[in-house]
Regions:
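Hydrophobic faces of well-ordered beta-strands that scaffold small-molecule active sites
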Residues: 13-16, 39-41, 74-78, 101-103, ...
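Short glycine-enriched, charge-decorated loop/helix-capping segments at active-site entrances
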Residues: 54-56, 116-121
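Glycine-rich phosphate-binding active-site loops on the catalytic face of alpha/beta enzymes
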Residues: 42-46, 101-110, 175-177, 207, ...
Length: 321
């Protein structure tokens, strides 16, 4: 097993990769004062090159191929369907600086589901070859982010021997099926059974939004760690709360101050990362949309209704007034 992207004898708390949301700016802000143990890139879409064997990755993706973000280990996530192209992409991303690589086998959305992401679970017979070839090509840690199954939540148990034989270093399990998308609830009873049945470290993912919920999942599953998504954007201090280094629940009014700081710093970074007022505003509102802020609150309504970055920033300053 290669060195994992977290310190031994710790229970790692990871920021989930969320396409269109956890971009470089979000990761940098959270790395500086949210303190996740591990960060993931948004998925890097792998397409065939001109000769159908080389990978074609965007320059933006390659710019994110680095070993860490502000000192926090960074895992580069790939999404694709063809073995040769995925292997070429893994080599290219490592050549650009990535150390830890992850294969997305869980994305449930249609355009990514044609054989990619969660769509790979419709072709389980191809997985030994794909995973084995990736393992040979990856010199650092190699992990898989996977759903419990495509339509059958028991499918993951038939995949565990495949993951073990391929030498996968750790699994991130979102305990829903692909067809569920984000409906219903993540079934962490499945996570607990997976932990019991594999020697691979398992990171629990899905519906972990509070300290109480996170601790319950750890106790129920005995997972090696947790991956936080929307919960960490709603409350960037959730990582520290889970460690017991911040209050278990935000005090009254505390979240507004946290959101103010988060959105203020994000707006500053987005100005350098994206082009033009319209794109920056769109990205800010995308972040706001996953923060699960109160819909009936006047300060948050002002953020949603802002027509310019300037108006958005003015509304940010009014949040904790």
């Amino acid at each position: 097993m290669r060195p994992l992207p977290w310190s031994p004898d710790t229970v790692p708390l990871m920021l989930a990769p969320m396409q269109g949301v956890t971009n470089r700016a979000v990761r940098q802000v959270l790395a500086q004062w949210g303190w996740p143990d591990v960060l993931f890139t948004e998925f890097m879409r792998v397409r065939p090159g001109a000769d159908n064997s080389a990978a074609r990755l965007s320059q933006g993706d390659l710019a994110d191929a680095r070993p860490h973000e502000h000192g926090v280990p960074l895992v580069a996530q790939l999404i694709g369907r063809d073995r040769e192209v995925l292997v070429a992409a893994a080599r290219e991303v490592q050549g650009a600086g990535a150390v830890h690589l992850n294969l997305n086998m869980g994305c449930p959305y249609g355009r990514m589901n044609v054989g990619c992401g969660g769509g790979m679970l419709e072709r389980p017979e191809e997985l030994p070859d794909i995973l084995g070839s990736l393992r040979e090509a990856i010199t650092g840690s190699f992990s898989v982010k996977v759903r419990a199954g495509y339509a059958d939540p028991e499918q993951v148990f038939s995949l565990l021997p495949v993951f073990e034989a391929a030498g996968v270093d750790f699994l991130v399990l979102h305990a829903r099926t692909v067809v569920q998308r984000y409906e219903g609830h993540a079934d962490h009873a499945i996570t607990a059974r997976v932990v019991q049945q594999t020697r691979i470290p398992v990171i629990a993912n899905g519906d972990i939004c509070t300290v109480e919920g996170g601790r319950r999942v750890l106790e129920q599953t005995r997972a090696a760690g947790l991956m936080l998504g929307r919960g960490a954007l709603r409350d960037p201090l959730l990582f520290e709360r889970l460690r017991g280094r911040a209050s278990a629940a935000p005090a009254e009014g505390e979240l507004r101050g946290t959101h103010q700081r988060f959105l203020r710093e994000l707006a500053q970074r987005y100005g350098a990362l994206f082009c033009g007022d319209a794109q920056v505003l769109s990205k800010l509102k995308s972040s706001l949309a996953v923060m699960d802020v109160p819909e009936d609150s006047k300060p948050y309504r002002a953020l949603r209704k802002a027509k310019s970055v300037e108006a958005f920033c003015e509304a940010v300053e009014a949040l904790a007034a």
